[in-house]
Amino acid sequence: SVNIEIPTERNLQLLAPDKNYESIYRPMSYIQQGVLQSAEERTRFRHAPRFAPAGQSTQMIVGATDESDRDILLLSSALYGRPTMKRVYYSGFIPVNPYDKRLPALDKAPLVRENRLYQADWLMRFYGFRAEEIADEQTPRLDLDIDPKLAWALRNPAFFPVDVNRADYEALLRVPGIGGKSARLIVSSRRYRTLTQQSLRQIGVVMKKAQYFISCRELTAGQGVNELRPEQVRRLLTAPQRRRQDRNEGQLTLF
């Protein structure tokens, strides 16, 4: 793997003046060319050796510089456009040198932000989301309190409700609480029966989230994201999380 480390060349040169993006992309291109050439040779010669059979990966440091999550995801999306790029990893910045004024004064690594970026990355790779949808110009930073799929749904209430008995697979993937496996089971199961709340739970749909974004026979009218409004749905879904955090913060430590 060849690590990009810093998401923009400007900040890369600020922290490492001897480096630039050309010195990073050159070996990336070399690896890509080798992988593609090896694949072509294997179509002609069965036992031709493989070149980097696992493909490429890279890593970016999150929180060391001022890039937004949108900047990071747009770069990741471009990297995934390369035919041999398999994974982009995100590593929260861990402060170890408090005397370097070029680095932010953080008490700890931004682990929640790192986790949200991995969730957004998953949406791009497996759920058909584009980077510009997950972090748009109005909201360039991911919401740390809710996952990026739910955040997108709350920003786009006009997309909902999704009829689980009629919607295509791609639309189902955009519903909070419905994953890839659940979406596939919905598509296959509804050929033989009309899906209800109970059958959706059995399939594995997280109804606590999905109920505000879907329509099916048993759901009460007026309880969707458009009737309740996104702000209220957000409060309903984050209230249990806040209560858990409050309980944890109220616990005494041993030392």
Pin down the residues of each PLM region.
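Residue-level signature of tetratricopeptide-repeat
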Residues: S189-R190
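Residues in the helix-turn-helix
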Residues: S182
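C-terminal extensions
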Residues: R141-A171, Q197-F255
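Conserved AdoMet/S-adenosylmethionine-binding subsite of the radical SAM
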Residues: S1-I134
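Short alpha-helical segments in extracytoplasmic peptidoglycan/chitin-binding modules
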Residues: L172, L185-I186
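A glycine-rich, aromatic-flanked flexible loop/lid motif
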Residues: R82-P98, D136-P161
